[in-house]
């Protein structure tokens, strides 16, 4: 069982950790053993984390995309499932233009563009629900089977059950990742700036398409 925080278009290391829990057994019949994933649903919202931001590779280098949330009496005191996306601000067209500019030359961008943007354009009220829809989308496109459930109460690190691999607080934009991130893959601007690791999983998907899973599993 893997315990993770919700994240907006999460980084590659997030999916590499899930892929470690997902096994393929080859014999006369291919059988799938889904990853068991539990999302932290009882924590309070934390600013400057992957909960509402992701990192992409743009023409000028690595760029942060931040999803605005509604500030109601201090977001850090609100449970994560109560955080609302601020749809009153006209940020979505700008974010979509930024993604198009960064990835329109990627081999698989046009293949995934409309289906990915349709999730954003559905404008779910809650951040947690939007992130969950995006997570399921990326898992499906990468071919990772996962059974997802949610915490029903908050447990401090070190207090979880022995069979739970607790990665809360490990995957963070302000700290270098200590997790397996897979092997380098082709990126549009690598010739100019070099390979950039642990970007949003959409960077991997747009560049590697159906081969994305092979880049994070060995």
What does each of the following model-derived ranges do?
Residues 1-218:
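Residues lining hydrophobic/aromatic ligand-binding pockets adjacent to catalytic sites
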């Amino acid at each position: 069982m893997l315990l993770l925080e919700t994240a907006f278009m999460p980084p590659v290391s997030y999916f590499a950790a899930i892929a470690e829990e997902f096994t393929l057994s080859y014999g006369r019949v291919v059988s799938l053993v889904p990853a068991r994933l539990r999302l932290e649903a009882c924590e309070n919202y934390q600013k400057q984390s992957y909960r509402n931001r992701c990192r992409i590779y743009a023409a000028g280098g690595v760029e942060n995309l931040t999803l605005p949330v509604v500030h109601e009496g201090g977001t850090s005191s609100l449970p994560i499932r109560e955080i609302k996306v601020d749809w009153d601000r006209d940020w979505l067209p700008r974010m979509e233009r930024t993604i198009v500019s960064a990835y329109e030359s990627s081999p698989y961008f046009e293949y995934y563009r409309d289906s990915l943007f349709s999730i954003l354009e559905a404008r779910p009220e809650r951040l947690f629900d939007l992130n969950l829809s995006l997570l399921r989308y990326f898992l499906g496109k990468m071919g990772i089977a996962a059974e997802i459930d949610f915490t029903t109460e908050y447990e401090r690190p070190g207090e979880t059950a022995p069979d739970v691999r607790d990665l809360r607080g490990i995957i963070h934009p302000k700290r270098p990742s200590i997790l397996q991130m897979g092997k380098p893959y082709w990126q549009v601007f690598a010739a100019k700036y070099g390979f950039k690791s642990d970007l949003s999983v959409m960077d991997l998907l747009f560049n590697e398409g159906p081969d994305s899973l092979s880049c994070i599993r060995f």
